[in-house]
């Protein structure tokens, strides 16, 4: 088994994390992103231009993105559901955007009120406009292992929708285990199916730690050639389908794993942990990251 020498971390805490937490002030969101920008991260998902009616925690994304201190080495991206969201994101200074659909019909209907096929059709005008502006588009694919409504997701279905997103024009597809039920054997089966169609360089993994399997699943993905991992500082973001359970895998834990495996990320673990402590203190809770907790205990 050969592991990659380098891994890119996509920090999703300021968006995917905070949208599932109690509200945080605009000032503290800006502060968090500025701290993260100083850690060596190359990609931070900074906001979302979904209707505030659906995601009220992200209503200030424009103000946040227009007031962060930008580093030339960092990509600041935003989630955009449609053409209007794209225009708003670009106006706010996003230099990359992301679209989202699901590998499961049930989740697609519950989450974005349409079929998978309809969701892909809706993205076509956005993709045309993004191409016109030379803005890269990332595709998020939810429920690649299981769905809270439909049960197990077929690996072939995951491969089909991943391929559709690539054909639509996405430079990369992030494969999301939305309810965190995946285990390495199931992740292996899913990735084998997707990798038969799409090269590893155009795939990322996005694991939730709801059932404590995220790091094991990331290790499995790394062993299969995946070199981009989504994660959230301090483990921000609960799981909306399991009340009180953890959601996104913590960036600190992923960094420690990579460090131990001799994989370069370019990210300073201690600086990132400090950013996590700041936002966790604001939220008045502990980081879900075990590495973060151990580091804080050691430094106190």
Residue ranges, per PLM feature:
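Catalytic cores and adjacent flexible loops of soluble metabolic enzymes
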Residues: 1-300
